[in-house]
UniProtKB/Swiss-Prot annotation:
Residues 98-278 form the ABC transmembrane type-1 domain. GO terms for cellular component: plasma membrane. CDD domains: TM_PBP2. This is Peptide transport system permease protein SapC. The lineage of its organism: Bacteria, Pseudomonadati, Pseudomonadota, Gammaproteobacteria, Pasteurellales. It is found in: Cell inner membrane. It comes from the Bacteria. Involved in a peptide intake transport system that plays a role in the resistance to antimicrobial peptides. Belongs to the binding-protein-dependent transport system permease family. OppBC subfamily.
Length: 295
């Protein structure tokens, strides 16, 4: 063991090998392609939507979906109480809900990852102090933290994103912090430190590759939470405001039409659930592929 190089304690493999394993999981691969399609939709929503998201068609209010007797193919998912095409609003909503969640997760992954690494390398009293701070945050639900932060700011989508970011960060940092602390307690780390290896070399060669699975799982979890929280904040009027076609805001604006025109509420809800399920299936498949190679 003493003759081993630091890289020999690395448990992860190349990205190409992981991809080959991942491709064998048909369902996970399909979910990956669908997620890419959703991201593509978010980027080019204004070109893909049949109509402008706030265009009102007079006399076409509460038109049911096209597969219902009264429905029209021109309004594939029907219209709302103002005569706006729901399909167009759902497509544009991809930019607001999915796009916002991706921006939040990207920020969490970078900021949370960096702070988690710094916290994980702390020792002694500093490490215990940081641990107690995290324990205090972990006693509160993420959505509750986001709601409290949002109430201190003016209701808007950007403020909802900021509140969601601040709410997720402590949990993300704590997970990375614990993963690194656990890795530092392993025998190979103690041995490498006795040989005089620097923390930077130790992180790069072994610790960070060995917590890749945990990192991916937390990023996927953060994405799911971001989608839910941004939609929830808009639903309770703390996020996106009218007439922004954010999915949570669409549900709020049409909630009173649930029995009269259920498609105006159910379709945005299905969009949220569909996005979350795709993310979970993809992350589980990727995690499984990494674990298979580590074995």
């Amino acid at each position: 063991m003493q003759n081993k190089e630091p890289d020999e304690f690395r448990e992860s493999t190349s990205i190409f090998q992981i991809w080959l394993r991942f491709r064998q999981n048909t369902i996970a691969l399909f979910s990956f392609y669908l997620l890419i399609a959703l991201i593509f939709t978010a980027l080019f929503a204004s070109y893909l939507a049949p109509y402008a998201d706030n265009r009102q068609f007079i006399g076409q209010e509460l038109m049911p979906p096209s597969w219902v007797d009264r429905g029209k193919i021109a309004f594939f998912f029907g219209t709302d109480d103002l005569g706006r095409d729901i399909l167009s609003r759902l497509i544009m909503g991809t930019r607001y809900t999915l796009g916002s969640a991706l921006l939040v997760v990207f920020s969490v992954a970078i900021i949370g990852g960096a702070l988690g690494i710094i916290a994980g390398l702390l020792k002694g009293i500093k490490a215990r102090f940081v641990g107690h701070i995290f324990d205090a945050f972990l006693s509160l639900p993420i959505l509750l933290i986001a709601v409290v932060i949002s109430t201190l700011m003016e209701p808007s989508l950007w403020n909802a994103m900021f509140a969601t970011l601040l709410a997720i960060l402590p949990y993300f940092i704590h997970t990375i912090y614990r993963a690194i602390q656990k890795e530092l307690e392993k025998d190979y780390v103690v041995m490498l430190k006795l040989e005089g290896i620097s923390n930077q070399a130790l992180l790069k060669s072994t610790i960070l590759p060995n917590i890749t699975v945990i990192y991916i799982q937390e990023v996927a979890r953060a994405f799911v939470i971001a989608v839910l929280d941004i939609s929830a904040l808009s639903f309770i009027s703390l996020g996106a405001q009218r007439p922004t076609p954010e999915w949570g805001a669409m549900i709020k604006d049409s909630l009173e039409l649930l029995y009269l025109a259920p498609w105006t509420v159910l379709l945005p809800g299905f969009a949220i659930i569909f996005t979350i399920l795709l993310s979970i299936i993809f992350s589980n498949g990727l995690t499984k592929a990494i674990n298979q190679h580590q074995e």
